[in-house]
Amino acid sequence: MNSSPGPAIALFLMFGGINGDSVVQTEGQVLPSEGDSLIVNCSYETTQYPSLFWYVQYPGEGPQLHLKAMKANDKGRNKGFEAMYRKETTSFHLEKDSVQESDSAVYFCALS
């Protein structure tokens, strides 16, 4: 029996911040196979208590809010993705247990 690997999912990663605050996330192109789990790191530096966001831009579309967390220990969820606002580690990592071809997009982390 001849089986071929499933389609690759392309995730392009960007970041954003304001007023001297900064966000650092996984850079470049990530190519998981369909069904793979995914973690996209997002860490931030700020002197405030920020709200945290993940945005997504699908091919041929403008950016749109993917998920958000307004305070520590909030968990944003959307389309099988989730991200936990972890104040103690200043992180908001985007995770999904099983990526699909329809997840191919540009993802970026931001704070306000």
UniProtKB/Swiss-Prot annotation:
It comes from Homo sapiens. InterPro entries: Ig-like_dom, Ig-like_dom_sf, Ig-like_fold, Ig_V-set, TCR_variable_region. Disulfide bonds join 42-109. Alpha-beta TR is a heterodimer composed of an alpha and beta chain; disulfide-linked. The alpha-beta TR is associated with the transmembrane signaling CD3 coreceptor proteins to form the TR-CD3 (TcR or TCR). The assembly of alpha-beta TR heterodimers with CD3 occurs in the endoplasmic reticulum where a single alpha-beta TR heterodimer associates with one CD3D-CD3E heterodimer, one CD3G-CD3E heterodimer and one CD247 homodimer forming a stable octameric structure. CD3D-CD3E and CD3G-CD3E heterodimers preferentially associate with TR alpha and TR beta chains, respectively. GO terms for biological process: adaptive immune response. This is T cell receptor alpha variable 9-1. One of its GO terms (cellular component) is T cell receptor complex. Glycans are attached at residue 41. Residues 1-20 form the signal peptide. Keywords: Adaptive immunity, Cell membrane, Disulfide bond, Glycoprotein, Immunity, Immunoglobulin domain, Membrane, Receptor, Signal, T cell receptor. It is found in: Cell membrane. Residues 21-112 form the Ig-like domain. Pfam families: V-set. V region of the variable domain of T cell receptor (TR) alpha chain that participates in the antigen recognition. Alpha-beta T cell receptors are antigen specific receptors which are essential to the immune response and are present on the cell surface of T lymphocytes. Recognize peptide-major histocompatibility (MH) (pMH) complexes that are displayed by antigen presenting cells (APC), a prerequisite for efficient T cell adaptive immunity against pathogens. Its main location: membrane.
